[in-house]
C-alpha cells in the first residue's frame, strides 16, 4: 500500500434534512397574544456506522415556544450527514463523530429551524452556537456515572 492510501481521510458525502415537523396547536389565537413566548431548545447527536468507513451523523433539534403554558409552536428537526472516515485511529473516531461532524451539520439545522419558524408566521429565532465538545464531554461523564464510576475512580453509592 502506498503512503497516500494510508493517509487520514475525512470526507462529507452528503448533508440532508432527514426529518422536519412543525406544530401550531393554538393558532390562530396564539397570534393575538402580546406577551413574548418563552423558548426552550434541546439538541441531541446520534451516530451510526453504515459501512466500514461510512457514518451517518444526525443532529436533532427541538424548539418549543410557549406563551403562558400555551404552546405557540413546536419544531422538531433532524439534520443528517454521511461522512467517509478512513485511516483515523479508532480512539479518534468517536470524538470526530460527536464533535466535528455535528459542528459541520448544526448551521444547516439552525437555518432549517429558523426558516420553518418564520414561514409559520412567527418572528425569527436565532439559535446560538453550540459547543459540541462540551456536550460530548458531558455525555461521556453521564455514561461513566451510569456505569457506576466517578471521574476520580471512586464508586458512587
From Swiss-Prot:
One of the proteins required for the normal export of preproteins out of the cell cytoplasm. It is a molecular chaperone that binds to a subset of precursor proteins, maintaining them in a translocation-competent state. It also specifically binds to its receptor SecA. It comes from Burkholderia thailandensis (strain ATCC 700388 / DSM 13276 / CCUG 48851 / CIP 106301 / E264). Belongs to the SecB family. The keyword Protein transport applies. It is found in: Cytoplasm. NCBIfam families: PRK05751.1-3 (NF004392), PRK05751.1-5 (NF004394), secB (TIGR00809). It comes from the Bacteria. Keywords: Chaperone, Cytoplasm, Protein transport, Translocation, Transport. It holds the Pfam family SecB. This is Protein-export protein SecB. Homotetramer, a dimer of dimers. One homotetramer interacts with 1 SecA dimer. The gene is secB. GO terms for biological process: protein folding; protein tetramerization; protein transport. The keyword Transport applies. One of its GO terms (molecular function) is unfolded protein binding. One of its GO terms (cellular component) is cytoplasm. Its main location: cytoplasm.
Amino acid at each position: 500500500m502506498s503512503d497516500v492510501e494510508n493517509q487520514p481521510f475525512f470526507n462529507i458525502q452528503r448533508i440532508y434534512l432527514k426529518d422536519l415537523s412543525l406544530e401550531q396547536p393554538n393558532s390562530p389565537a396564539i397570534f393575538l397574544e402580546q406577551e413574548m413566548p418563552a423558548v426552550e431548545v434541546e439538541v441531541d447527536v446520534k451516530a451510526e456506522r453504515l459501512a466500514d468507513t461510512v457514518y451517518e451523523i444526525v443532529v436533532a433539534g427541538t424548539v418549543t415556544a410557549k406563551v403562558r403554558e400555551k404552546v405557540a409552536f413546536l419544531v422538531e428537526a433532524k439534520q443528517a450527514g454521511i461522512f467517509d472516515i478512513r485511516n483515523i485511529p479508532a480512539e479518534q473516531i468517536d470524538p470526530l463523530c460527536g464533535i466535528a461532524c455535528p459542528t459541520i451539520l448544526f448551521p444547516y439545522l439552525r437555518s432549517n429551524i429558523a426558516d420553518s419558524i418564520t414561514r409559520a408566521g412567527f418572528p425569527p429565532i436565532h439559535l446560538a452556537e453550540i459547543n459540541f465538545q462540551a456536550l460530548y464531554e458531558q455525555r461521556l461523564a453521564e455514561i461513566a456515572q451510569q456505569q457506576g464510576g466517578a471521574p476520580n475512580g471512586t464508586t458512587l453509592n
